[in-house]
Structures are given as C-alpha cells and as structure tokens.
Amino acid sequence: MQPKPLLIPRRALAGVVLPLMGLAARPAQAARIFRFDHTQGRLEFTARHLQVLTSTGQFSRFACELSLDPARPETARVAVQVETGSIAHAYPGAADLLRSPAYFDAERWPMARFSGSARPGGRIEAFDLAGPLELRGVTQPFTLQAKLARRRRDPATGAEIVDCTARGEISRAAFGMTADTLATGDRVQLAVLVSLVIS
C-alpha cells in the first residue's frame, strides 16, 4: 500500500518551500512541529548479502516528530519510535527471522528509539541530525542526513508536493546482531521517506 502524503497547512510550510523556490527568506519564526507516521511515509532498511546482493525491508509501524524552524535549521530536533516487530520483507521467512533473538529480538525489545539534534552548518535543503539510537537494549551514536529531495506536482490532483528523505547507516554488530556474518554484511542502511503536500 502506497503511503499517503502528509497534509501540512500551507502556512506552516511556507518557510520550507520559499528557499527551495529561490525566493527571499521570511523573517525568523518559531519552530514548527511536524508529525508523521507509517501512514504518510516509509521507514526502510537495506542489507548486503554475499557481497553481491541487497535486500530491502520495511517497518510498518513507526512515528516521527520533527521540530524545525526553516530560518534556523541548526536548531532542528527529531524523535522517532519504531515497533521492531512490525517488519515487512519480500523474502519468505525473512520477517520472522529478523524478529527473532538473533536479530531485532522484537519480543524482548519491542521498541527502537532515536532522538537527534541538527549539527551546525546545515541548510534547510540538507542538514544532519545526530543523537543516540537505542536498539535491542544498546545505545549507540547515530546520524541521519536529512534532505528536501525535490518538488513536484501531482498530475492527478495538481497538488504541489515536497519529497523528503533522511538516511543513515548502522553496524548491526554494534547492536549485538552478529548472526550470519558470512552471508550478510555488517553495515545496514536506514532510510525515512515522506511526501509533504504543500498546496
């Protein structure tokens, strides 16, 4: 099922859209709170196998809250919660394996959490969010590279949409997931993808 675009009031997104359109920035304003979940976006993970193949799965239940002042992206903050048992995967049996104690151990650790703040030097079009990632009872530093990827117009409705992404990488061994090291690589790519309707 395709995720529904997140409906955000036009006024709330004005400060985000204007820089993308090359227009003059508005005066500084208070940070806005944007909330979205699995009904409006996707949270994917990708692993490499046998140094040749890749596979991608999703978490079908998660929630995210982003605090963002478009005039000061360096003050952005994000909080994400993920239900680790909500894994969906195309390969038969993969979801059950990933929920097992060898991987996410979803029964014992049903939630993963990330809380990040923007690093200095970012722009509204691209900025890093860094902070602790808690997974399987282990907490490690983690960074998401957030981008406002592109603007487009929905040909069916005429609505203007901004596509946003946030990507990062973890070592699964750092969180205690050391099974099947000969078949599956240690580095796992994480990606959040969401579409914002602005008009």
Regions found by a protein language model. Name each.
Residues 10-11, 172:
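Short, cationic motifs built from Arg/Lys/His that form the positively charged side of catalytic pockets
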